[in-house]
């Protein structure tokens, strides 16, 4: 299988038309005619993930987040004076690693919709973007669950996503209509309100949006952008295997500890 075959098969499964207009998906750097020797699936395209790919014998780095949205002015070795994407592209070329990304087109997939609530044993009824059309691809997951307090839900999320979430709302409030949106909540809190959700689980949310939703009676749980989307790497890996890349040559890059919070004298 060539890199171009892998890219076209992935984009057939997660179409470009489902990506946001501003997004950068597909092959960013690499030789389309190179034979695929192995694929490392990673949330981000970083120097560390490139080197991890090489150490595993992989010449394709398949990521959720694009190496860039807008291309940097130059592609050079690492420097504090240039964006990190400049060095990543430079190093990818030097190492002969192709970088393919599936971003908002993956976010809108049925696989992504099922992924996050599935970690808690919940099923998505529809997307948050198109709540009245369960068959349509769309961002987010609208769910229903047995009544649970916001505090207990937050503990389950902490354990399932291995993170230290930020929670808005009364921990004793009972919720039963959660909605999930990996990454950044943005303006989708209003869609959650209109859809009748009573708690939104996301990666990150601005202070004023979280405060507003909380004051209107909705619980908000922010897991961390990266923690909320790391499960998507398994979707990428499964897609590669189903396309025909041998399972023994497909890997998932563990999420690095990029941020931390102090707790009881330790760092977690």
Give, region by region, the residue ranges found by the protein language model:
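Hydrophobic structural segments
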Residues: 1-268
